[in-house]
Amino acid sequence: MPTQPILVASIADGTGKTAVTLALARLVQERDRRVGYMKPKGTRLQSSTGKTLDRDPMLARDLLGLDGEMHQLEPVVYSPTFVDSAIRGQEDPDELGDLVESQFRELATDTDLMLVEGGGDWTTGGIVDLTDVDVADRLDATVLLVAPYRTAEDLDNVLAAADAFGDRLAGVLFNDVSDAAFDELESDAVPFLERRGVPVVGVLPHDRDLAGVTVGDLTAELGADVLVGGDTDGHIERFLVGAMGGDAALRYFRRTKDAAVVTGGDRPEIVTAALEAPGVNAVILTGGHRPPAAVLGTAENRGVPVLLATGDTLSVVDRAESILESGRARDAGTVDRMRDLLYDHADVDAILSGDDAASDADE
């Protein structure tokens, strides 16, 4: 018999939920247990039409060697088209909930533990009664809540989610915690939550390998043209908009690291300033303009990639931020790194306690 499923929910999109879910699945497999995976609401789509699939279940199927079909792993494609249909009364919440349950039962066959990944944040799906709270109730799942932490004010959201999940909450896992916030979280915030009856099962530090996106991945996601090649493994954690004068831009750019500068191709002085800043790992040009050949030559000499993306600066920044905030687990390497972080900084036995009990019963 499978043990009680674990639903991995998150306070906000882009908190590393997919990496955590898949890393836990790998840990279960390393214990010689049979694991299953499901993401009831597909939210990370390649298009907004609902005709494409969520990338997370596709990655899960490949990494975990699962046999389930995509319509089982992701029964509800939560696209803008679907949302529009739902608010017009064209989607039946009861039928959708029953669909999730039936696909879950099929996937759970011959598994020891099912891991269920929430979609978006924990409130996503409310228009069709499929929030993570609703899904946990339907599947009788315990809940691991993945949360960010920057300041103590973030605890308001944690407490609200903990109250909504109630007794189903197995624990909170803080992820991607900066050095500046780490001590305060461990010394003050964690004891506060535990006094309020909210268990904390881990605090994972910021890890460069899991944050941001590589220049190569960003280029592919944006569909950008490469004007100047360079270090495609360069790391991007933030985007800076170049809209000021050259001198001011240089002072601005020098205060950052692991950044990409987004600016119009008709602003060569901004591009030049970006190329002089050691923390800028790429320049993204917009508006269909190319800078002078001399500027591109400087970029080539410095090994800084220069990309040309379709659209104006605002739209390109929005798309780039969306890529960055997806927090996606890109490959086996990122999942394995998350597994190591869980080993070092989380109580894995507490998270997987139901599966351990099942394993002991089988022996």
Region locations from a protein language model:
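Structural motif
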Residues: 5-7, 34-36, 58, 70-71, ...
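C-terminal accessory "lid"/substrate-recognition subdomains
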Residues: 171, 175-271, 275, 328-363
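Conserved catalytic-core segment of NTP-binding enzymes
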Residues: 120-202, 266-303, 307-323, 327-329
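N-terminal phosphate/diphosphate-binding loop that engages ATP/GTP or pyrophosphate donors
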Residues: 5-15, 19-106, 181-183, 189-195
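Fold-independent oxyanion-binding glycine-rich loops
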Residues: 10-12, 24, 40-41, 55-56, ...
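P-loop NTP-binding module
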Residues: 5-8, 98-118, 241-245, 249-254, ...
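Terminal disorder- and signal-encoded targeting elements
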Residues: 1-3, 363
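Phosphate-binding/switch loop-helix module in NTP-utilizing enzymes
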Residues: 83-128, 133-137
